[in-house]
Amino acid sequence: TTEELEELENEVVSKDDNIKTMQEFVSPESLYQELIASVKKYHPSTDISLIEKAYKTADTAHKGQVRKSGEAYIIHPLCVAIILAELELDKETIVAGLLHDVVEDTVMTVEEIASEFSEEIALLVDGVTKLGQLSYDADKVEVQAENLRKMFLAMAKDIRVIMVKLADRLHNMRTLKYQSREAQLRIARETQEIYCPIAQRLGISKLKIELDDLSLKYLEPDIYYDLVDKIAVRKSVREKYIQGIVDEAVSYTHLRAHETSAHL
């Protein structure tokens, strides 16, 4: 649609590799501060103690784990939580974002999360963990459809589970360049076929557009970079046009000011 094209025009260039993608190789502590600032922006009076506890818990649980990029694993859940905060989601969802991988990738259990935090947060994390266990095979349409049905069922139980999973997938797509080419194609295709339609169904255009954009980047790189170039040119032309109008307005204002002073 025209709206999606305009949003893509504003965002696509900034997603390229030579531009800083979200929070790559930034210290965990600075990311945590960014997360808190983002939450307080839309919920100034929120009690951050639970978020802080979740951050420390996840940091301890993932200690020693490293992503393929070489950065500490805790960077990933922090970035997921920041994406959720940008969508202005509730504190429990932010906490679930921070903890979303501890059951799958560490020794921590759902029962421990329920005990340390709450049953509500434990259910969110458990839901995300179960979604992560769904397999996808692009060559088997029936399996793909079944995955979609399961995701819709999970969405019906608590939409926040899907929100965390979408944020998780978005950050993984933003850092997909560190994966093998085979993994890039598999993950990008899965994103295009499963996650983009879910984001569209939920009406989250911001996530849907970026997921579409990043999928195209790996599935059809020639088309993607051609689009990036065209958008960059179009944006440059538009900026020059706007600057020309501004310059004319400034010149006119100066001229009027000069004429006024001459009459005094």
Language-model-detected regions and their locations in the chain:
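Active-site helical microenvironments for divalent-metal-assisted chemistry
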Residues: T1-R256, S261
